[in-house]
Amino acid sequence: MRKFFGRLFAVIGGLVFFAVLGSMASLFILGKKEQALPEKAVLTLEVSGNIPETRGHVPFPLNLVQQSLSLYDLTCTLDHAASDPSVKGLVVKLGPNSLGLAQVQDLRQAVTRFRAKGKFALIHTDTFGEMTGGTLPYYLASAFDEIALQNMGNVAFVGLSMELPFARRLLDEWQVVPRFAQREEFKGIMETFTLEHMSESSRTELTALLKDIMAQIIQDVAKERELNEDEVTHISQSTPLYHAEEARRRGLLDQVTYYDLFETYARKKAGPGGALFPFAAYASHARRKGKEKSKDRPIALVFASGQIVRSATISPVSLMPTEAISSDDLTDIFDELLDPKKPKPAAVVLRVDSPGGAPIPSETIWRLLTRTKEMKIPVVVSMGNMAASGGYWIATAADKIVAQGTTITGSIGVAGGKIVLDQLWRRFGVEWGHVATSPNANALSPNEDFTPEQWQSFNESIDYTYTYFLHRVSKGRNLSAEKTHEVAKGRVWTGKQALELGLVDQLGDLHSAIALAGDLAGLDKSTTPAVTIYPKNQGLGGIFSGAFGPLLDHDGAQALLKSFVAQAVSATAYPAYRPH
């Protein structure tokens, strides 16, 4: 116990130390004189690593000296730079990054808007994949005026693929029983446990999905590179990779050079007096300029990313909530937005990027949006990389839904159940004893199978949830019951397909959704609407409320204590093991 509390206070002390150190560093940075913007600036940006949707609620000091720009920061800054006469162009150094398909389309569209204002946009990378993995980064690069590749780099524009494991034979060998139900044939999330091979319905669904996404990529690449679509298709199917010179010969590249030389080329392209200027420094400049907002009420932009849960769990390492869409957290945000004592937002844009989650918090969030609409506040949902299952459940409450062409959309279905381990335990000589006040108190335990009555009741619950989900879609999207069932069955669609099926209203990025919300609210179209972002960025005080706030209530204290106990036990009794 003494070791446990030693570790506990060591973590707390470390958090306080780094928070204060980070705050001092940030104050030092803020106190430095701002770099003067050159008259002919070329913005330099590295796109690599983790690029979050928004800076969110993670306090700045926890990142010490620097905090990476979010995707929203990038696109807003590019839009600002497009209208700035001092900015002549952009040069990007592209590295491995976390951008998904829809986010790549967001960034491509921002680059296109930048170029449409007469600016040049250049991009360089050391390689577009190695044998594989180059399609998505090349898709991003194709939106730029010029693409440069380092010597010895490759262009692995090889298309898209999915690989899924099917572990039924392994589970059978270990006498583990996967007891799952799904509604309907395309809701195959649990098939990895229940089947030995991919089902034909899953193969049909995923093949159609990848083909539609790849068709969008080929169409966009062909347009920007001034190539024939058949030629781009042939390139994607003919060889695993092209070396730099061969890729240039085929029209995929403009230059084969090193990044330092490419920067010099970009500076000269801006004309006499052209100078490189860091994108992050310009972003700070743009944020200050951007405070000159319209006189209209602001639009509330709420970011919601991750699995949908009732309450976000707390990491025992960082002492901060893990990334999730928490109905509790969103309830707090919307209670603030709808507070009758405060000015109401002109509209609400909810940015959803989620693979789904539990139906109960999904329904809670659905109600938050309908409450907002009842107060005559327009609601627009912008869907990111995906809005599947519970993510789409939430979206059905919106006045309008905006998605990218590649957004994974739908999965209108239900799956659930449990892994049954009783035979595995017996195999290793372990017996579980239990006591209960009723026959069904232990129904969801993995240590015993469902009884026939419990399995029937569980399936009835799955049917009820599925029917309820269908009703939400039918009413929210104004579709007949027959049409709703046709597009449901657990199937996922691209945003482009979803538009044709009536599941979304418009294709576009987050900025398109904000503009649409402004139109619904009747805001002045001649000015850029003011936007207030939620969750709000916290300062130093937010660290302690975020980290220690859960200690103020019993459930939070229990969760945090369990996390510390798991960490302390694993470090002392089993040094080689870390719980996941």
Roles of regions detected by a PLM:
Residues 34, 41-164, 291-424:
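Cleft-lining beta-strand/loop regions that shape enzyme active-site pockets
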Residues 223-224, 254-298, 415, 471-476, ...:
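C-terminal long alpha-helix characteristic of the crotonase
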Residues 13-20, 34-37, 62, 78, ...:
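Non-catalytic accessory/assembly modules
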Residues 303-306, 352-354, 383-385, 398, ...:
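Active-site proximal loops enriched in glycine and acidic residues that flank catalytic Cys/His/Asp
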Residues 296-345, 461, 534-580:
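Intrinsic disorder and flexible/low-complexity segments
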Residues 2-35, 39-40:
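Hydrophobic alpha-helical transmembrane signal-anchor segments
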Residues 351-352, 427, 519, 524, ...:
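C-terminal recognition in membrane/secretory proteostasis and scaffolding
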Residues 164, 168-267, 422, 426-524:
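Charged, glycine-interspersed solvent-exposed loop segments at helix/strand-loop junctions
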